[in-house]
Amino acid sequence: MNNKNNGNSTKSICTILNRRINEIYDALDMGVSLEELNAVVISCIDEAKASGNDSADEAKRIFNSIVARGNYNHYLTTLVTYMTCINC
């Protein structure tokens, strides 16, 4: 299986995060916990994985490890990185 982002078959994490940006902003505006914000982000990553994106497992591991350390600022920096990473 070719796992590059070719058309509509495999979706990039970036594409899904940006499509669901309002959901993420709403969570941030409500001041949700890091775990609750992560649930929204992980659902986006799971959507990418379901489309065949091989980088989704690694992204999930990265976000979950940041949550385990409780570093909100690092989490937001990583989230912005993923939202601008066209090929991830």
Residue locations for each model-derived region?
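Short terminal alpha-helical segments
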Residues: 2-30
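Cysteine-centered motifs
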Residues: 85-88
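Acidic, low-complexity, intrinsically disordered interaction modules
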Residues: 34, 39-69, 73-77
